[in-house]
Structure formats: C-alpha cells, structure tokens
C-alpha cells in the first residue's frame, strides 16, 4: 500500500471512474521527496530514467498487482525531466509519461471556447500533432462538460479506457491529454463515463479523418494547410458573373468498370475536371463529403463534419481535386448540412449522457421526416462547432462556397409538424430565432474571414430576405435556390402541349418575385429520384418530342434570369432515375446505344454554357430588373414566350420559346431596338437532332408596330424549341411607319372629296388603314414527319398540321 495514495483511489483508476488523474499520476512532492506514480496495466517492472543522463534513478514499486506503480526518487526535492523504462515480459521499452506534461491549452483559447466565440475551435479541439517540452506527440481535447471521466483510447493503448484518462478543465468543460509518440493514421476514440455512469465510446467530433463504414473510429490526421482565396476565384462568385453549376455525387459520377467500386479523389479529378471544363460549367457543386455512415443518405446525414469521407481516399486527395479544378478555372462549392445529424451511437447523440448537441425535447430535437436529431442552435458551443466547420472547409481546402441544405427545416419550428408537435419561440411565433441567428453568424464569419466565398441557401419557402444582409433583416446568403420557379416550370413541362395554354402563368409567375432575392435556378438531384423520373422521363410525347421538349426547356432556363444548376446526367438526358449505387449511363452517348439523341443533348448543353459565358446579357443583370423585359408574355394560345435580356452596356439578346409541336411561321413580335439580329442558338437545329427549322439569314427589324413596339421582326419559331437572337447591328429608325403611308393616302383622298374632285365611298380613313394592314391567313402548312433511324428502333415525330401565326 502506498503511503500517499489510498487503495480506494487506486481502485477508481482500475474501475475507470477517476475524474482527476493528474492529481494522482505523474510526479508529486511528498514529505519523503519527489514521488513518481504510473498506471501501466500488464507491466512487470518500471524504472525511472533521467532524461538528461539516461541513468536509472530508481525502480518503482508495484503498489497494486493490476499495474499501479509508485516510488520516491532518492535525493530529489524538485521536479525534473524523466522517462520510464517499462518491462513487458522480456521486452523493455523506454516511454514518456503522459502525466509528466503540463496543460497545453492557453487561457484565451479556453475562455473563447467556453464562451462559444472561438473562430477556429478546430485548431484547438480534436487531435493535433504538436510538441510539449521538446517531445513530439498528439494533443487530444474533447468538449464533454457533463462526463465524469473521459479517456482517449486507440490501437496505441489496446482500446483500454483505464490507461489514458484525461485532464478536465472545469471552466470550459474540455478534457485534455498529450500522448507522446502517437503517429499519423492511428485509430482512436474517446471513452466517456457519462453523467449516468454509463460508458460511451464516441468518435471525435473534430477528427480530420475517419474510418470507412461500417467501422467508426477516428483517425489521427494532420490539420490541412490554409489555401488562400484568389481574386480570380473571388470574382467568379459575384452576382454579375456567369455561374453555371454542375452538381455531382462523387460516388456515382463514374465508377470502376470492373468491380463497380468508387474511384478515388485523384482518379475522379483526372476525368471530372476536364469534362466539366469542356462542357462549359463554371462551378462544381459536390454533394456532402463530411464522413457519413449510411451510403443511402448521399452524405446528408453526416457524423464526421471535419473529415472528408474516406470512401474516395484521403483529405490530401480531396485537396488535390479542388486544386486541379482551380487550375482549370473552375470554382468548387460544397453541400453543407448543419440542420441535423443521425442518431448513430458513435456520433453526437447524448454525447456525455445529456442532450449536448441536440435538444432534449423531441418536439425541438427530433426530425421525424429523416429520423435524425436537430442541433440546439441556442447553445453557443454548438453554434461555434457548426459555424467554424463551414470556415474550415473553405479555408483549409480552398473551397469557394457552401450550399446550405434544408434551410427551411432549420428556420421554422413547425417544419413538417402538426399542431401540438412543436414548441413556439419566446414570442409565440413559429420561427426558430436561434437557427436564424446561427445562419447570420455563419455567413458573417465567412464573409469577414474569407471575402469572396459564396453562400447559397436551399430554402423552399417564401421566408423574406434570405439573400439580404443581416442589417436589413436578412440571413446574409448570396444566393437562394429558386424552388418555386423549378416546381412551376417542371409542372408546366410535364403537361401535354395541348393543355399548356391553360397553365401559361406557370412559366411567367416567377418574374413576380424574381428580384426579391438573388436566385439560382436548380435542376438538382432531388428532381430525379424517389419515383419522380429523370428530366427526360418527365417530358411528354414520343421520343422525338421528349428530347425536343427537354432542349427547349434548357434553352428557356439558360435564357431566364438567375444562375444555373444542373445535376449530373441531365446534361446528356439520362433516361432513368439517378442511382447512387451505380455510375451514370455514359453508354448512352454511344451511337449504338443512344442513337445520337443523348449525344445531341450533351452537345446542346455544352453550347448553351459557352454561349452563356460569352454573352453578358444572359448573366450580368440577373439581379437587376433593367436586365429583363417581356416582349410576348400573354400568347397562351400558342404557348409562345419572348423576352429580352440586357447587359450593363445595353447589349441585347432575345429569347423565344415555343412549347407546342407546331411550327410558328412568320411569327411577328415587337422589339425595342431596330437593327439586325442574328440567331446564335436554336434548339431545333439539325446538330441537336431537331427538325432544322432555323433562321439562318440576318433578321432585320421592320417599321411595323407589334406588341406595343414601333419596331418588330418576323421569324419562324420551330416546334418545341427555344431560339436566341442577338442584336448584331443597330439601325436608325425611319420617322414614318408603313401604315403611315396608307394613312397619308387616305387623308389626301379626304381632301380631294372636300374639293369635289372625287366621290366619297362609305369607307373611312380607319377602314382604309385597316384593310391595308390586314394579314391574310395563308394555307395550312404541313410539317413533314421527322424520321431518325436508331439501332433496333425507329424514332418518329408525328406529322403535325401547322397554322400560320398572324399576330
């Protein structure tokens, strides 16, 4: 029995219940001199060595057969640097004593973490390579204020929670321990004795690397180096720049052909980046990459927020992918999920025996739609954990933005809940005031620490001010997904063209609220799963009409105000729904399998993107009403839409869409600027497998009034197609219109009548003008059937009777 340590105290160590190991273990002053005490289960002998001379100073006595050793070092009365020589059977090992090191967290960090205002808690908490007293090792820190004991366990200590209990900082609730000679890649977890005396084995919330499911341990990894934001990347995120986003799920974009297994980050980068560059996309948006246990969640139920998923390799590999994208001039956005987390036992749930990260009341803390838990945004440490995570991804991996998932579920307490299933806020309202404040805080943190980083909200309600600055009462996002536009327009496109005239407003209503927020038009992964069909599958008609409808829709979308987002596979009109367990159907791009149809859509999207990037009217004034004007908004009978886009320099592009399978010949509409227009895009062109009803010659305005405009043009609008006309040359407008000559003649006739030189007819001047300007209907034109031979199939577009437009 040791004179200075009771048996009951020793028992608490072996029972895993001692809360203050540094008060007992290590070096201590006693009346007999300096005593060294160590806990080394299974050790047979332990000697104390002088670190300076390497001489043996004393052998420690085995105070307890289970492995508690203690002994007074002769002739010493002050602390000194020492090592331990430990004999495990016949094998001797010289080690550092973890309990010989002083606390490493400084007072400022401890105070900021306690307050929940540390900008970068990931630099303090978690596992960090460092040196203490010139000894290299890893410093482990964990926030678990209600735990009775916390130990770090891993393959370096046989996962034995008795061996390395940690030091507790009462003021912040943080546990800390420095372990020498622990190396990169080693596995670890934290073993907690919770407030109910239950053992919990938890992954590190701040781990920089994690095991691949079904394993759940954290891995010791280095904190990635900072990647600075560049002016080029910053500019590419601005609202007056072209932003066309390619949304990607890395696990199913492409897979290994031999075993259907994932490609790693480097393999993906080798293929994905050149493809995106060639296709003309400006940004890549990656579905969530924080480590997650369930493949079927697609990453939207993460546990390791600071760990890039090991499915595709290491954090360094992911960083190389981002760097390769930047070298190609492509910005990278990451889907980020701060709204909820899964209830897997190794994660955040009941972390220290209490509802530490979540709400205790299920009415606030449980998400019934997804069977997940909701973060407690009212707790400063939780807000700090989440907000700094967004900064971590931007700063340490050089990402250019985040897209925040499911914002509506965060900001409304009654989201997807019936009456009685939710708790009002302090004012009796339904808004989650703490979540709203958290979002503002996160956007402010990103904006001040990395100016130029873009934040995007997936917000599906009409919550006001999502993209307005907080000082105006907004949330501070830069862009918001326009879910209303997406739902309305897809609903319209699903309908048979014969019924579209009754739903005309679905394509125009978006302009009512277009300038209330900064919008992105999203055709995301959510629209091609869970029985919703692929985008191609949503389109009505036979094969020819399906592809024509989709091309026309894309053209309308790329011409409409708002940045663009397209989920992978939609750029070549994949026919089946997205399956996260398989690669995209790239074989459809082969002539044999796809008959050229899918390749044509791919070519079309590529051309759309490049035209979009090169023409400022299509993007520069997306958030300014001066950049848009309807030219034909009410032609519901023909399902025709015409609008004009403008740039800051007053360049003009006119977008014309015809959503019926009827060729609109000599369709006349008014324009603002007289001059020559050139057709720069036609979704019905032959190279896109259309019927090739194009306007190849210059289109010159005429002095004919139409749609309340003095100048107008007349073109053929192809069936189920979108056409872009670009103002090529401005001309001076003649003072008199063609109808004015008729009016002139009629007036002269009236004067002759007055002088008796001719006889008045019953026709008035107005009658004369009306007759002269009347357009006689032409004969019905029949558009021949378009036939495209495909291997083993024949795709036929039905012959359609087309009436001439007389507007």
UniProtKB/Swiss-Prot annotation:
Source organism superkingdom: Bacteria
Pfam families, alphabetized: Alpha-amylase, Alpha-amylase_C, CBM_48, GlgB_N
Keyword Membrane applies: no
Signal peptide from the UniProt entry: none
InterPro entries cross-referenced by the UniProt entry: A-amylase/branching_C, Branching_enzy, GlgB, GlgB_N, GlgB_N_E_set_prok, Glyco_hydro_13_cat_dom, Glyco_hydro_13_N, Glyco_hydro_b
EC id: 2.4.1.18
Catalytic-site annotation from UniProt: 405 (nucleophile), 458 (proton donor)
SUPFAM superfamilies reported for this sequence: (Trans)glycosidases, E set domains, Glycosyl hydrolase domain
GO molecular function (one): hydrolase activity, hydrolyzing O-glycosyl compounds
Protein's GO biological process: glycogen biosynthetic process
Subunit structure, as described in the record: Monomer.
Family: Belongs to the glycosyl hydrolase 13 family. GlgB subfamily.
Function of the molecule: Catalyzes the formation of the alpha-1,6-glucosidic linkages in glycogen by scission of a 1,4-alpha-linked oligosaccharide from growing alpha-1,4-glucan chains and the subsequent attachment of the oligosaccharide to the alpha-1,6 position.
Protein name, UniProt field: 1,4-alpha-glucan branching enzyme GlgB
UniProt organism field: Histophilus somni (strain 129Pt)
Higher taxonomy: Bacteria, Pseudomonadati, Pseudomonadota, Gammaproteobacteria, Pasteurellales
